[in-house]
């Protein structure tokens, strides 16, 4: 078992991005401070009843896994899932502020043209259009606004897939996480399984923590054969240091390791839209547990102590990452979603209705905790993740 002290940072990645927050936290917070995404006044049309939301995100280093799969198997359609990853990372963030209709999306592909040929680019574009149509079929109005393909071989040895989404919603529909206060139930929605609108089983991995997941699980075979897929300045001890190849079965799962790592990020937008239509403003807050994993909630609300004492059992992909790497529980919950990638905050009397709605989408949901008043002397938010064996404290 290797040293688990901040393994993510040793690969050049920060789960907290504290240095980024140190800068942006002093900038204008927009029309509704406290929302999951920044919301501005309607600068595009000038409508006083509307506002603007614009958001950028992407598939991160998950595209490297698709690249490896393509190089070994020759099937460019593996990039269909990467297209979905990039889109979902934007749309699900927007959904956490109440935006899910009349969204225009643009995509940017930064590639090494030598390693990422035209047939793969075509598959990526095809995957984008296919997923957007699936969303529209589910009642989520998202349209493509085009995109950009940049050949930047000196920047990347493979490919980076990013998206940007913009909408002009009514101010009245915005979900403001500043309404997260003591006395609320926290409802978690499973990231694994197979929802009613997914074509295959989902491992729950999402699009966060993939740098560590890839290196912790995959073997030196990939270090030797794909030097373009990692930073040469990273200590070799932390590069492809796992026991598996992509086609190996994942323990306690129906998926291979590669399938689990490449499992397309589930969108919760149809579910969250349905919940909002049923309980309206009694949906006090929503958090997409992406970067920062289970600690993401700490950035929202004020004077809140988040108690999570009924989490889902971690899906097999997270169990195996921990088993082979020795990563601490503290770091696992900061890097990975650990079983639920969306949580909402509502009064306890609405919990059963929310869980019932989720069941209609075949997504497991349950009350995973509650909010209390912070015990910090300076009013700072706190988080406790409790299990039978230990309590993890953050904040």
Each predicted region: which residue ranges?
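Helix-biased detector of long, well-ordered alpha-helical tracts
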Residues: 1-395
């Amino acid at each position: 078992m290797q040293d688990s002290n901040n393994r993510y940072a040793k690969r050049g990645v920060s789960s907290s991005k504290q240095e980024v927050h140190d800068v942006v936290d002093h900038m204008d917070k927009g029309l509704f401070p406290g929302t999951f995404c920044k919301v501005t006044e309607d600068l595009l049309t000038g409508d006083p009843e509307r506002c603007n939301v614009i958001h950028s995100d992407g598939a991160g280093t998950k595209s490297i896994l698709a690249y490896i799969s393509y190089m070994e198997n020759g099937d460019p359609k593996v990039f269909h899932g990467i297209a979905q990853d990039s889109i979902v990372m934007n749309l699900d963030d927007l959904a956490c502020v109440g935006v899910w209709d009349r969204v225009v999306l643009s995509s940017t592909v930064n590639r090494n043209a030598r390693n990422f040929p035209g047939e793969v680019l075509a598959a990526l574009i095809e995957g984008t259009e296919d997923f957007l149509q699936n969303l529209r079929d589910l009642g989520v109005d998202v349209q493509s606004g085009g995109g950009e393909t940049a050949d930047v071989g000196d920047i990347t040895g493979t490919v980076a897939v990013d998206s940007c989404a913009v909408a002009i919603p009514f101010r009245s529909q915005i979900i403001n996480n500043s309404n997260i206060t003591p006395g609320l139930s926290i409802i978690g929605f499973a990231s694994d399984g197979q929802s009613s609108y997914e074509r295959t089983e989902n491992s729950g991995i999402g699009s966060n923590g993939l740098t560590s997941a890839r290196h912790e699980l995959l073997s030196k075979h990939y270090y030797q054969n794909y030097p373009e897929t990692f930073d040469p300045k990273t200590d070799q001890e932390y590069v492809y240091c796992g026991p598996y190849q992509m086609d190996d079965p994942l323990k306690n799962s129906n998926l291979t390791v590669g399938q689990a790592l490449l499992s397309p990020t589930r969108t919760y937008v149809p579910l969250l839209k349905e919940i909002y239509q049923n309980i309206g403003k009694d949906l006090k807050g929503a958090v997409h547990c992406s970067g920062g994993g289970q600690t993401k909630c700490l950035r929202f609300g004020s004077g809140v102590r988040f108690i999570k004492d009924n989490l889902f059992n971690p899906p097999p992909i997270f169990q195996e990452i921990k088993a082979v790497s020795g990563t601490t529980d503290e770091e696992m919950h900061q890097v990975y979603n650990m079983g639920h990638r969306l949580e909402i905050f509502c009064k306890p009397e609405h919990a059963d209705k929310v869980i019932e709605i989720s069941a209609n989408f075949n997504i497991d949901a349950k009350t995973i905790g509650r909010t209390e008043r912070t015990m910090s002397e300076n009013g700072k938010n706190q988080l406790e993740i409790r299990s039978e064996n230990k309590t993890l404290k953050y904040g």
